[in-house]
Amino acid sequence: MIHTMRYLLCLLFCLLAGVAQAAPAGKAYMSIIIDDLGQSPDRDSRTLALPGPVTMAIMPDTPHASDFARQAHKAGKTVILHMPMDPATGPYAWHPGIAIDELARRLEAALAKVPYAAGINNHMGSRMTAQREPMAWLMGELQQRHLFFVDSRTSAATVAAAEAQRIS
């Protein structure tokens, strides 16, 4: 299963970098993720005009989340859910101490607000990404859904990558 996770992580980097073919030796690629989207139609539409493979990270509790996700998908951009995590607030936010079934409900509701999400990244989330049990559950859930996770690395104590690698 470690090989499966490595494959999924490799696939993630290829998707985000927009690599359609093998990269020549020595050539570097950079992935760009713009987050906090879904709040302002004017600002959000400007991000769609950016050239190349730019990933749009959309917050589920914003007024234009669903519409912008559809627009971004139609424009050929990769869409991801910008999942609110502690200390973020709101109806979708994850906080330490919330039961897994409630975290699952919030994830399901957030994904419903951001159609075409190919994966998720954490909005804030320093305390949440340091929690082993929720991160282990999340990595397993994302694997079942064929979604990826990009850790915003808002904390040196994050266990997200370690839990993703432990999936067997």
Kindly give the residue locations of the regions a language model identified:
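N-terminal secretory signal peptides that target proteins for export/translocation
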Residues: 1-5
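Catalytic-site microenvironment of enzymes
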Residues: 6-9, 22-168
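Hydrophobic h-region of N-terminal signal peptides that target proteins for export
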Residues: 13-22
